[in-house]
Protein backbone atom coordinates (compact mmCIF):
# COMPACT_ATOMS: atom_id res chain seq x y z
CA UNK A 1 0.00 0.00 0.00
CA UNK A 2 2.71 2.41 1.06
CA UNK A 3 4.79 1.34 -1.93
CA UNK A 4 1.89 2.08 -4.28
CA UNK A 5 1.39 5.53 -2.78
CA UNK A 6 5.11 6.26 -2.97
CA UNK A 7 5.25 5.15 -6.59
CA UNK A 8 2.28 7.34 -7.45
CA UNK A 9 3.85 10.32 -5.68
CA UNK A 10 7.16 9.85 -7.49
CA UNK A 11 5.39 9.54 -10.84
CA UNK A 12 3.43 12.72 -10.12
CA UNK A 13 6.62 14.58 -9.22
CA UNK A 14 8.34 13.35 -12.37
CA UNK A 15 5.38 14.41 -14.48
CA UNK A 16 5.36 17.82 -12.82
CA UNK A 17 9.08 18.22 -13.43
CA UNK A 18 8.63 17.21 -17.04
CA UNK A 19 5.88 19.76 -17.52
CA UNK A 20 8.03 22.43 -15.88
CA UNK A 21 10.94 21.64 -18.16
CA UNK A 22 8.68 21.61 -21.17
CA UNK A 23 7.31 24.98 -20.16
CA UNK A 24 10.85 26.32 -19.77
CA UNK A 25 11.78 25.06 -23.23
CA UNK A 26 8.73 26.73 -24.73
CA UNK A 27 9.63 29.97 -22.96
CA UNK A 28 13.16 29.84 -24.33
CA UNK A 29 12.51 28.80 -27.92
CA UNK A 30 8.76 29.03 -28.45
CA UNK A 31 6.54 31.36 -30.46
CA UNK A 32 8.31 34.49 -29.22
CA UNK A 33 11.41 33.32 -31.09
CA UNK A 34 15.00 34.27 -30.41
CA UNK A 35 15.36 37.02 -27.75
CA UNK A 36 17.57 38.99 -30.13
CA UNK A 37 14.62 39.27 -32.53
CA UNK A 38 13.05 41.82 -30.18
CA UNK A 39 12.99 45.34 -31.61
CA UNK A 40 14.39 48.46 -30.04
CA UNK A 41 11.81 51.11 -29.06
CA UNK A 42 11.17 54.00 -31.43
CA UNK A 43 14.15 56.41 -31.14
CA UNK A 44 11.76 59.27 -30.39
CA UNK A 45 11.07 57.71 -26.98
CA UNK A 46 14.79 57.89 -26.07
CA UNK A 47 14.34 54.44 -24.48
CA UNK A 48 16.26 51.25 -25.22
CA UNK A 49 15.83 47.51 -24.69
CA UNK A 50 18.21 45.08 -23.01
CA UNK A 51 18.17 41.29 -22.98
CA UNK A 52 19.60 40.55 -19.54
CA UNK A 53 22.27 37.86 -19.63
CA UNK A 54 24.02 38.42 -16.28
CA UNK A 55 22.17 39.68 -13.18
CA UNK A 56 23.64 42.39 -10.99
CA UNK A 57 25.96 40.81 -8.42
CA UNK A 58 26.67 37.77 -10.58
CA UNK A 59 30.11 36.25 -11.16
CA UNK A 60 29.09 33.78 -13.87
CA UNK A 61 29.30 35.11 -17.42
CA UNK A 62 26.18 33.86 -19.17
CA UNK A 63 25.63 34.44 -22.88
CA UNK A 64 22.53 33.90 -24.99
CA UNK A 65 23.48 31.77 -27.98
CA UNK A 66 23.30 33.62 -31.27
CA UNK A 67 22.00 30.51 -33.02
CA UNK A 68 19.76 28.74 -30.47
CA UNK A 69 18.65 31.60 -28.21
CA UNK A 70 19.45 29.53 -25.12
CA UNK A 71 21.32 30.76 -22.06
CA UNK A 72 24.85 29.31 -21.98
CA UNK A 73 27.52 29.47 -19.28
CA UNK A 74 30.43 31.12 -21.08
CA UNK A 75 32.83 31.19 -18.14
CA UNK A 76 33.24 31.98 -14.46
CA UNK A 77 34.84 35.33 -13.63
CA UNK A 78 38.24 34.42 -12.17
CA UNK A 79 38.78 37.70 -10.33
CA UNK A 80 36.97 38.11 -6.97
CA UNK A 81 34.53 40.68 -8.39
CA UNK A 82 30.85 40.73 -9.34
CA UNK A 83 28.98 42.53 -12.11
CA UNK A 84 27.95 45.96 -10.75
CA UNK A 85 24.68 46.04 -12.72
CA UNK A 86 22.49 43.85 -14.90
CA UNK A 87 24.52 43.15 -18.04
CA UNK A 88 23.47 41.95 -21.43
CA UNK A 89 22.94 42.60 -25.12
CA UNK A 90 20.75 45.10 -26.93
CA UNK A 91 18.65 43.26 -29.56
CA UNK A 92 18.32 44.81 -32.99
CA UNK A 93 21.75 46.45 -32.81
CA UNK A 94 25.16 45.61 -34.22
CA UNK A 95 28.36 47.01 -32.77
CA UNK A 96 31.71 47.30 -34.52
CA UNK A 97 32.64 43.75 -33.52
CA UNK A 98 29.54 42.35 -35.24
CA UNK A 99 27.75 41.51 -31.99
CA UNK A 100 24.84 43.41 -30.40
CA UNK A 101 25.76 46.41 -28.28
CA UNK A 102 26.50 45.65 -24.63
CA UNK A 103 24.70 47.51 -21.85
CA UNK A 104 24.48 47.67 -18.08
CA UNK A 105 21.26 48.67 -16.33
CA UNK A 106 21.30 49.64 -12.66
CA UNK A 107 18.35 48.32 -10.64
CA UNK A 108 17.38 47.99 -6.99
CA UNK A 109 17.35 44.18 -7.25
CA UNK A 110 18.94 41.77 -9.77
CA UNK A 111 16.93 40.95 -12.90
CA UNK A 112 16.57 37.35 -14.08
CA UNK A 113 18.69 36.29 -17.10
CA UNK A 114 16.66 36.19 -20.30
CA UNK A 115 14.32 39.01 -19.27
CA UNK A 116 13.70 41.97 -21.57
CA UNK A 117 14.31 45.21 -19.69
CA UNK A 118 13.30 48.60 -21.09
CA UNK A 119 15.71 51.28 -19.91
CA UNK A 120 16.83 54.88 -20.30
CA UNK A 121 20.42 55.27 -21.56
CA UNK A 122 22.42 57.68 -19.41
CA UNK A 123 25.83 57.42 -21.01
CA UNK A 124 28.49 55.17 -22.45
CA UNK A 125 31.75 53.87 -21.01
CA UNK A 126 34.30 53.89 -23.81
CA UNK A 127 36.48 50.78 -23.66
CA UNK A 128 38.81 48.75 -25.79
CA UNK A 129 39.22 44.99 -25.43
CA UNK A 130 42.28 43.50 -27.14
CA UNK A 131 42.59 46.79 -29.01
CA UNK A 132 39.03 46.68 -30.37
CA UNK A 133 36.26 49.13 -29.45
CA UNK A 134 33.97 47.57 -26.83
CA UNK A 135 31.69 50.33 -25.55
CA UNK A 136 29.24 49.73 -22.70
CA UNK A 137 25.94 51.61 -22.64
CA UNK A 138 24.86 52.42 -19.06
CA UNK A 139 21.30 53.16 -18.02
CA UNK A 140 18.43 52.83 -15.56
CA UNK A 141 14.90 51.41 -15.92
CA UNK A 142 12.31 53.65 -17.56
CA UNK A 143 9.87 55.31 -15.17
CA UNK A 144 7.04 52.87 -15.96
CA UNK A 145 9.26 49.95 -14.91
CA UNK A 146 10.68 51.60 -11.78
CA UNK A 147 9.99 55.26 -10.87
CA UNK A 148 12.85 55.14 -8.35
CA UNK A 149 15.14 56.52 -11.05
CA UNK A 150 12.76 59.18 -12.39
CA UNK A 151 15.22 61.95 -11.55
CA UNK A 152 18.15 60.22 -13.24
CA UNK A 153 18.14 61.45 -16.84
CA UNK A 154 21.79 61.84 -17.83
CA UNK A 155 25.28 60.74 -16.85
CA UNK A 156 25.69 63.74 -14.56
CA UNK A 157 22.72 62.51 -12.49
CA UNK A 158 24.42 59.18 -11.79
CA UNK A 159 26.36 59.22 -8.49
CA UNK A 160 30.11 59.30 -9.08
CA UNK A 161 30.43 56.23 -6.84
CA UNK A 162 28.32 54.21 -9.30
CA UNK A 163 30.52 55.24 -12.20
CA UNK A 164 33.62 54.40 -10.17
CA UNK A 165 32.26 50.92 -9.37
CA UNK A 166 31.60 50.21 -13.04
CA UNK A 167 35.05 51.43 -14.02
CA UNK A 168 36.71 49.39 -11.27
CA UNK A 169 34.96 46.21 -12.39
CA UNK A 170 35.93 46.47 -16.03
CA UNK A 171 39.45 47.55 -15.16
CA UNK A 172 40.22 44.28 -13.35
CA UNK A 173 37.67 41.60 -14.28
CA UNK A 174 39.95 40.08 -16.93
CA UNK A 175 43.19 40.28 -14.93
CA UNK A 176 42.89 36.53 -14.36
CA UNK A 177 43.56 34.06 -15.81
CA UNK A 178 46.91 35.26 -17.14
CA UNK A 179 46.92 35.80 -20.86
CA UNK A 180 43.38 37.20 -21.01
CA UNK A 181 42.80 40.05 -23.46
CA UNK A 182 43.81 43.48 -22.19
CA UNK A 183 41.01 45.93 -21.36
CA UNK A 184 41.56 49.70 -21.35
CA UNK A 185 39.10 52.44 -20.38
CA UNK A 186 38.83 55.69 -22.32
CA UNK A 187 36.35 57.86 -20.44
CA UNK A 188 32.62 58.46 -20.55
CA UNK A 189 30.15 59.88 -23.01
CA UNK A 190 26.84 61.43 -21.96
CA UNK A 191 23.27 60.41 -22.83
CA UNK A 192 23.47 62.09 -26.24
CA UNK A 193 26.65 60.16 -27.07
CA UNK A 194 25.00 56.91 -25.95
CA UNK A 195 21.91 57.63 -28.07
CA UNK A 196 24.05 58.35 -31.13
CA UNK A 197 25.92 55.07 -30.65
CA UNK A 198 22.65 53.15 -30.29
CA UNK A 199 21.16 54.78 -33.41
CA UNK A 200 24.26 53.88 -35.43
CA UNK A 201 24.11 50.29 -34.15
CA UNK A 202 20.40 49.99 -35.06
CA UNK A 203 21.17 51.26 -38.55
CA UNK A 204 24.09 48.82 -38.87
CA UNK A 205 21.85 45.91 -37.86
CA UNK A 206 19.38 46.80 -40.60
CA UNK A 207 21.92 46.74 -43.41
Spans of features found by a protein language model:
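N-terminal secretory signal peptides that target proteins for export/translocation
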Residues: 1-4
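Bacterial N-terminal signal peptides
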Residues: 10-22
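Hydrophobic N-terminal alpha-helices or hydrophobic patches in metabolic proteins across all domains
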Residues: 27-207
Amino acid sequence: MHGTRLGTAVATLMLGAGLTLAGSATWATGPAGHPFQARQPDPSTHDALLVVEIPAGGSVKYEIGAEDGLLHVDRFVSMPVAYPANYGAMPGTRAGDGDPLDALVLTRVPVHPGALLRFRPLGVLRMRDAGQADEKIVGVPVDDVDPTYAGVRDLADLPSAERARIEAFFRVYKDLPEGSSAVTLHGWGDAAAARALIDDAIEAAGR
